């Protein structure tokens, strides 16, 4: 039964025309937006041809959005921060798209795509759209088609695009070339993270925020802020 259902969904996606995808995205049909993103992620030659045609039609649309990249080491609380930030934005009548990039296993090729489960409130918000995607081996903290996915979300009317990176640290600089503002979340007690900082991701961040800076971690967070200020000569 499941196999037949998946086959039907696949056939249905293949039957959609370029106009179907374009109209669906422009009307902010979330199901068609999700299918369009899946289309551009596909490596199938036929899908790629359709995806290119869809993107060419959507690129001519006026795009008036703010793109914000959010990075940080694993465990820093990116997803929790994004949910709180996203809810604040939607409360101000912004439409927020979250592109959450998850790492892909080098052994199995699989990805958990679990970021959305940590944004349960935001995922139910009618003014928010969350799309988890695997890196599929792409370096730089983003996926192979992150730029194209941003274009689709902008065409759908989302005026704030939040790009959450994989969270592997200093190598995630590609996202900085795709966004208007680049935020690096750091943990209290910077320690070894200051090593090699001049060539690292913190050097190109527009803002550094020390997260989890409450309770017993407040003093450590204050020390971390001072260390970053001295290291970066702010």
Regions found by a protein language model. Name each.
Residues 81:
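Hydrophobic positions on the alpha1 helix immediately C-terminal to the Walker A/P-loop
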Residues 68-70:
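Hydrophobic anchor at the beta1->P-loop junction of P-loop NTPases
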Residues 182-186, 204-214, 227-234:
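Conserved beta-strand/loop subsegment of P-loop NTPase cores
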Residues 6-13, 216-234:
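C-terminal accessory "lid"/substrate-recognition subdomains
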Residues 19-28, 34-66, 76, 85-171, ...:
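Nucleotide-state-sensitive switch-loop elements of NTP-binding domains
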Residues 73:
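P-loop (Walker A) phosphate-binding loop of NTP-binding proteins
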Residues 2-25:
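Long, basic/Gly/Ser/Thr-rich N-terminal segments
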């Amino acid at each position: 039964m499941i196999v037949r259902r998946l086959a039907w969904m696949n056939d249905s996606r293949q039957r959609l025309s370029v106009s179907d995808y374009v109209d669906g995205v422009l009307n902010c049909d979330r199901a068609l937006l999700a299918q369009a993103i899946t289309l551009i992620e596909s490596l199938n030659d036929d899908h790629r041809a359709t995806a290119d045609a869809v993107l060419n039609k959507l690129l001519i649309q006026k795009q008036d959005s703010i793109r914000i990249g959010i990075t940080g080491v694993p465990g820093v609380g990116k997803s929790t921060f994004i949910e709180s930030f996203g809810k604040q934005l939607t409360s101000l009548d912004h439409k927020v798209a979250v592109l959450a990039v998850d790492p892909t296993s080098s052994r199995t090729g699989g990805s958990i795509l679990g970021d959305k489960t940590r944004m349960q409130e935001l995922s139910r918000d009618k003014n928010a759209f969350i799309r988890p995607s695997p890196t599929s081996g792409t370096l730089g903290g983003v996926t192979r088609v992150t730029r194209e996915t941003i274009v689709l979300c902008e065409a759908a009317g989302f005026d704030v695009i939040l790009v959450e990176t994989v969270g592997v640290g200093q190598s995630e600089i590609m996202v900085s070339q795709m966004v208007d503002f680049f935020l690096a979340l750091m943990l209290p007690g910077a320690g070894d993270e200051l090593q090699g900082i001049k060539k690292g991701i913190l050097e190109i961040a527009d803002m550094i925020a020390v997260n989890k800076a409450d309770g017993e971690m407040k003093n450590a967070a204050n020390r971390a802020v001072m260390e970053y200020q001295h290291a970066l000569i702010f």
